[in-house]
């Protein structure tokens, strides 16, 4: 049992398509930079929303996402309207992180964050996204503060 607790504390399993499915090793944070995969604890309202919607199992209380923007590249965050798709797309630099929806995959209302509120205002705020089109990420729950980030994560076993 003791060994299991040590393993559980140092690893996590990604079971949604926000990132590649698999087992991720958790590492202490020395610094946080764009491109890092991080484990974080969303605020209570976000956790309750996620659980009420069934986006994650009831036992989950942390999320894992990629850091795609910080204070240094905040001006690269933009929303571009795609006339073919008739959707707003979220870009950071030249990378398209996909549509911003007003309904989730089950047709329920979902409220995206405004462009202004997606841009970090100081060095302790980060935009965390996934390029998976159904991801529930910062475009809906907002920026994540450094205090909420628990660990860095790297995939060790891909499913």
Question: What do the PLM-derived regions correspond to, one by one?
Answer:
Residues 1-7:
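Hydrophobic membrane-insertion alpha-helices, especially the h-region
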Residues 8-159:
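Soluble "head" domains of membrane/secretory-pathway proteins
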């Amino acid at each position: 049992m003791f060994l299991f607790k040590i393993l559980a504390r140092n690893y996590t399993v990604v079971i949604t398509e926000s990132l590649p499915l698999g087992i991720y090793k958790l590492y202490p944070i020395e610094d946080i930079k764009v491109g890092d995969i991080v484990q974080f604890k969303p605020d209570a309202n976000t956790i309750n929303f996620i659980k009420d919607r069934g986006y994650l199992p009831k036992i989950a209380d942390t999320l894992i996402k990629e850091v795609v923007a910080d204070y240094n590249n905040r001006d690269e965050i933009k929303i571009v309207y795609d006339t073919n798709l008739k959707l707003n797309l979220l870009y950071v630099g030249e990378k398209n992180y996909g549509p911003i929806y007003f309904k989730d995959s089950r047709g329920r209302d979902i409220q995206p964050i405004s462009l202004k509120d997606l841009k970090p205002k100081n060095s302790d705020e980060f935009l965390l996204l996934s390029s998976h089109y159904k991801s529930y990420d910062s475009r809906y729950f907002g920026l994540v503060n450094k205090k909420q980030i628990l660990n860095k994560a790297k995939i060790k076993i891909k499913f």
